[in-house]
Each structure stands twice: as structure tokens, then as C-alpha cells.
Amino acid sequence: RRQRQMCIRDRLMHDFGAKGLACTPSYALYLAETIHQSSIPLEEFQLRVGAFGAEPWTENMRKELETKLNIKAYDIYGLTEICGPGVGGECECQNGTHLWEDHFFPEIVDPNTLQPVEPGQVGELVFTTLTKEGMPMLRYRTRDLTSLTYEKCACGRTAVRMGRILGRSDDMLII
């Protein structure tokens, strides 16, 4: 039954001409494996782009996804607690996640002292929502460890960019 479901999903992506894929990077690697095992050659799929998040992933995983699915793979970031379609996403330069500063004020703090760290240093990501009504978040601790850069991106955007998630300050695992 599972093999049949995989074939149906792959067939639907093929038949509807899906050009984009949004999921976790680990699920995208699983999809790549099933597509390569299917009777439909990868060249017949129209996939061109993937937006991946909800779990940490590496540059090696990005390269593997881009090679195995013949797509451009972009990192996205969001939090259930913050709501909305996310907090930021990578641009075509793939050099950090642009955070939407018109809606969120990001900070990096030392997880032990909660004091701000210098730009570029790794610490815990903290958000204050600027436009969320009803339940605004003030200095919400994400427990995600990363860094921020305020340098202008090669794409021309000036929004702060977040580096990859490097770990958690609370060592929490979701199983």
C-alpha cells in the first residue's frame, strides 16, 4: 500500500506539472528517492524550486536536494507561536534568510545572560512582533541558536539576514 501511495503522489506531481515543493528537507530527500525509484524519469517532472524548513538542514543537504530533484532549494523559517506564513525566507543568492523586519524585531542574545550579542555572533534568536494583534510576543525566546548579519545582500535587499539554525539552547528534541 505504501509503495502505491508513493506512486500516486509522484504521478500527481508529474501530471499536474508541480513546479514548487514546500516541506521539510528530510521529506524532500525521501521524495527524491521515491521519484528515482518510480517509472517516471526525473526529466519529465517540472519541479524547479523548493522551500524547505521546520527542521535544521545543511549546505550538503541543499546540494543533494538540488542535484537529486534538479531544483533550486531555499531555506524558510517560521514559528508556530509567532503565526503567519513564516518569519523569513532566502532570496536567490541563498546567503541567509531575510527576516521580515516590518513585522518582527529580531535579536540574538546570550542564552545564559539574555544580553544582546554583537552582530555575527551566535546566540539565541529572540523575536518581538510588531504587527501581531491580540497576542503580541515581546522578546519571545525561540531557543534556536543562530546569528544575524546586517550587511546588504547581493540581491539588493537590506533586511537583516539570519544564518542557519545551528542547534538549540534547551537541547529539546521533537520525536
For each predicted feature, which ranges?
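Short, small-residue-biased leader/transition segments that mark boundaries at the very start
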Residues: 1-8
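Active-site glycine/GP-rich loop and adjacent strand/helix microenvironment
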Residues: 9-175
